[in-house]
Amino acid sequence: MDVETAEEQGGPAPPSGVPCGPCSAGAPALGGRREPKKYAVTDDYQLSKQVLGLGVNGKVLECFHRRTGQKCALKLLYDSPKARQEVDHHWQASGGPHIVRILDVYENMHHSKRCLLIIMECMEGGELFSRIQERGDQAFTEREAAEIMRDIGTAIQFLHSRNIAHRDVKPENLLYTSKDKDAVLKLTDFGFAKETTQNALQTPCYTPYYVAPEVLGPEKYDKSCDMWSLGVIMYILLCGFPPFYSNTGQAISPGMKRRIRLGQYGFPSPEWSEVSEDAKQLIRLLLKTDPTERLTITQFMNHPWINQSMVVPQTPLHTARVLQEDRDHWDEVKEEMTSALATMRVDYDQVKIKDLKTSNNRLLNKRRKKQAGSSSGSQGCNNQ
């Protein structure tokens, strides 16, 4: 059956009380590679028009396993070498720690075109930073940030041990299994993943706010791209805003490129005043502009701030409050990244490295101006 027809005939979703079970007894083993099933996906799953998200190469829809009633996520990719590469890399990683599992893959027709349909576990807990945003007045601590970074690092370590570079590690690709307190954080979307061999990666595709410096120039890059992204995510976790910004409203600007390539960022007060030196040191090691000097994933996992996360101070951070106050800007940044994902390519000629005495961070400037205005009327302090 054509997928389009199946969507129209999907009918109501199964009731929430239907017991859940594994979506498919034929799910691949850890790191397995398999051929897609050739029969109709609708034989096994009831499709919904509910869009759960947008990946690099295709949209993600809600679906239900007909036998068990379990809610799953379906990603639709039009068949191409790039799509098959995404499926292959995700299949190799599926079942690894803190990585979204593939449950089934089908090869069907959709709009008279051959497509691949990836059935994945449904991540009902939402995005990493949305979860922190929604905490309200409940403090988010440095120890919690360390535990989150350890989980993300565990996923990257699994990939790198199998010579896979994810190349698009960013907040939107980090999802929770549920809204429960003990939900597991997992990495998804292998649309830009590549196997790392003796030929270093050179394809200029990336998400601009989390892109390593060497991606912006003619240098080769490899797994160290993921390490740079870990540094940016860790920075945001500890303060609520990223270290680099485009001040022009573009997804990525020449000024932002220069700041990234020069590694120009700071640890401004008050957001960073109480953050431990161990955390700042780890960020510096991850954001090294020379990929050969950047930490490997093994070194990252062995860093005291990560492997001794239980003794990291429980210092309350500004992160949740900053994310809430700047929610509109954060959404704008995400929209810019989404639109840039599939279309942006690097123009090396625009990269002109000049020494910048200060970093002009648009969001930070706005925050400082607002703080200056409020401090004139009140001497109180917020030590969240």
UniProtKB/Swiss-Prot annotation:
Active site feature: D168 (proton acceptor)
**Family the entry assigns:** Belongs to the protein kinase superfamily. CAMK Ser/Thr protein kinase family.
**Tree of life domain:** Eukaryota
Motif placement: Bipartite nuclear localization signal 1: 352-355
Q: What does this protein do?
A: Stress-activated serine/threonine-protein kinase involved in cytokines production, endocytosis, cell migration, chromatin remodeling and transcriptional regulation. Following stress, it is phosphorylated and activated by MAP kinase p38-alpha/MAPK14, leading to phosphorylation of substrates. Phosphorylates serine in the peptide sequence, Hyd-X-R-X(2)-S, where Hyd is a large hydrophobic residue. MAPKAPK2 and MAPKAPK3, share the same function and substrate specificity, but MAPKAPK3 kinase activity and level in protein expression are lower compared to MAPKAPK2.
In this UniProt entry, the residues modified to N-acetylmethionine are M1
From the UniProt entry, list the residue stretches annotated as the region p38 MAPK-binding site.
347-371
InterPro entries the record matches: Kinase-like_dom_sf, MAPKAPK_C, Prot_kinase_dom, Protein_kinase_ATP_BS, Ser/Thr_kinase_AS
What would be the name of the gene that encodes this protein?
MAPKAPK3
Q: Provide the Protein kinase domain boundaries.
A: 46-306
- Protein name listed in UniProt: MAP kinase-activated protein kinase 3
The subunit structure is: Heterodimer with p38-alpha/MAPK14. The heterodimer with p38-alpha/MAPK14 forms a stable complex: molecules are positioned 'face to face' so that the ATP-binding sites of both kinases are at the heterodimer interface. Interacts with TCF3 and with polycomb proteins, such as PCH2 and BMI1/PCGF4.
- Provide the binding site for ATP: L52, G53, L54, G55, V56, N57, G58, K59, V60, K75
Question: Which Pfam families does this one have?
Answer: Pkinase (PF00069)
Kindly list the GO molecular function terms attached to this UniProt entry: ATP binding; calcium-dependent protein serine/threonine kinase activity; calcium/calmodulin-dependent protein kinase activity; calmodulin binding; mitogen-activated protein kinase binding; protein serine kinase activity; protein serine/threonine kinase activity
Protein localization:
Nucleus; Cytoplasm
Gene3D superfamilies registered for this protein in UniProt: MAP kinase activated protein kinase 2, Phosphorylase Kinase, domain 1, Transferase(Phosphotransferase) domain 1
